């Protein structure tokens, strides 16, 4: 995809025609890739640099100086708080799931070779179709932790993230971006077409990842003796998930406009976690690490919202393919919002692209960041790309399969005509 930025007004500082904000954002991403042991510090420094530049030089989209910053945060706080509460809440949920000892009985039903590891990815894929992809990835990570004796290959971790994002790409309940499409008026069946590409993609990346994992640490062949499932803890897991699903459905069906006014889903998960304390104590010890990872992701997301991107190239399958690669480093929520504003996309193709595309780098999706909090060794772009090479291949193959089998059927623009080039906002 040929992404171009329109002519920069003289009042907007730029380097070789590229706004300074993009340069600062790119420098932050490079820093995260190079200094993977200090990702939070790099992200916070990058955020401070972008905010400082907007504050003192260009102003914000909502206005200059402090008033503009406050107005911008007022627009974004619901999304940020939802992400924060979901990341921390689902981290506690995944620990509940692991301690329920359900993963310890999985050897009863899973094959005892690489096919067992692949079946686990399919389970994550299915879970993500009706759960949030963050929860599906963390549950998958908890199962892998037990089944592979806490030795999980980075390539397999990348596949877990890919499975969770693929499973959510065709469901209006499985991912934030598809829920945004649903709220905006896109029909669920139009989004469902994404599963054509997602199914091919999970096969392409799942088999190599499963073989990687089996060679690295074979799956348990026998369940632990005298395993007794903690049923009350299972009930806690079901209760928290039910709260999230019910809130998501009720808000988006009955009062979709309210979803932008308060972080209902995140708050419902937090309340469910607190209410379940009377049944089983959550593993509060993991909260600091979960919060650290959440703040890192929120820093990236917030930086992305400050970028002066107002328009996308014309809606086409080439644009959708490119947006998938962009979503690996640029938050897919604002990309999806811009695409909805523009209209004219095949929403199934776009849902697959921005959903699965974020799996190519560990911080490209909220599911990847959440899982990396459990497996810190995965916080390396180089190792993720090296061992998770099959995810990038799967994205391209899955996209091609989606176009070949389902075709490109764009919907008529429903938000008015939008130009076909990137434009630069002065923020004033």
Predicted features along the sequence, with ranges:
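Membrane-interfacial loop-to-helix junctions in multi-pass transporters
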Residues: 16-21, 79-83, 109-122, 148-158, ...
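Interfacial loop-to-helix junctions that mark the boundaries of transmembrane helices
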Residues: 9-17, 34-39, 65-83, 111, ...
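Hydrophobic transmembrane alpha-helices that form the pore/transport pathway of multi-pass ion
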Residues: 115-169, 180-184, 337-352, 377-380
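Cytoplasmic-side transmembrane-helix entry/capping segments in multi-pass membrane proteins
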Residues: 40-49, 106-119, 152-162, 285-298, ...
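Short helix-coil transition sites and intra-membrane helix breaks within transmembrane domains
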Residues: 36-39, 93-101, 127-139, 167-175, ...
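Transmembrane helical segments that form the transport core of multi-pass membrane transport proteins
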Residues: 240-345, 426-427
């Amino acid at each position: 995809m040929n992404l171009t930025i329109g002519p920069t007004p003289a009042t907007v500082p730029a380097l070789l025609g590229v706004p300074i904000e993009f340069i600062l954002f790119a420098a932050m991403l490079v820093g995260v890739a190079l200094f993977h042991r200090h990702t939070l510090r790099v992200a916070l420094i990058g955020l401070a640099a972008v905010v400082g530049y907007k504050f003192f030089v260009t102003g914000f989209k909502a206005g200059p100086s402090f008033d503009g910053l406050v107005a911008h945060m007022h627009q974004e706080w619901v999304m940020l708080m939802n992400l924060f509460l979901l990341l921390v809440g689902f981290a506690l949920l995944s620990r509940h799931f692991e301690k329920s000892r359900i993963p310890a009985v999985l050897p009863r039903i899973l094959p005892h070779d690489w096919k067992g590891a692949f079946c686990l990815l399919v389970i994550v894929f299915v879970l993500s179709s009706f759960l949030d992809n963050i929860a599906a990835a963390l549950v998958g990570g908890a199962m892998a932790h037990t089944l592979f004796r806490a030795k999980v290959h980075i390539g397999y971790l990348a596949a877990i993230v890919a499975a969770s994002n693929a499973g959510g790409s065709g469901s209006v309940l499985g991912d934030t971006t598809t829920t945004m499409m649903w709220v905006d008026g896109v029909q669920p069946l139009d989004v469902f077409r994404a599963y054509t590409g997602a199914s091919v993609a999970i096969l392409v990346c799942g088999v190599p990842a499963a073989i990687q994992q089996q060679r690295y640490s074979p799956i348990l062949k026998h369940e632990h003796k005298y395993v007794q499932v903690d049923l009350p803890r299972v009930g806690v897991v079901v209760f928290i998930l039910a709260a999230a699903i019910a809130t998501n459905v009720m808000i988006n069906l009955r009062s979709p406009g309210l979803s932008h006014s308060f972080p209902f889903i995140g708050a419902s998960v937090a309340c469910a976690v607190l209410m379940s304390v009377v049944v089983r104590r959550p593993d509060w010890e993991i909260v600091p690490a979960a919060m650290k990872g959440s703040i890192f992701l929120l820093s990236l997301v917030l930086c992305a919202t400050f970028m002066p991107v107002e328009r996308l190239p014309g809606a086409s399958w080439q644009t959708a393919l490119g947006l998938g690669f962009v979503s690996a480093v640029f938050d897919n929520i604002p990309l999806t919002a811009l695409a909805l504003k523009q209209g004219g996309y095949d929403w199934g193709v776009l849902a697959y692209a921005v959903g699965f595309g974020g799996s190519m780098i560990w911080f490209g999706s909220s599911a990847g960041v959440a899982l990396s909090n459990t497996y810190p060794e995965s916080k390396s772009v180089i190792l993720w790309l090296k061992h998770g090479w099959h995810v990038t291949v799967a994205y391209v193959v899955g996209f091609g399969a989606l176009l070949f089998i389902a075709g490109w059927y764009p919907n008529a623009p429903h938000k008015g005509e939008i130009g076909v080039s990137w434009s630069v906002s002065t923020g004033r």
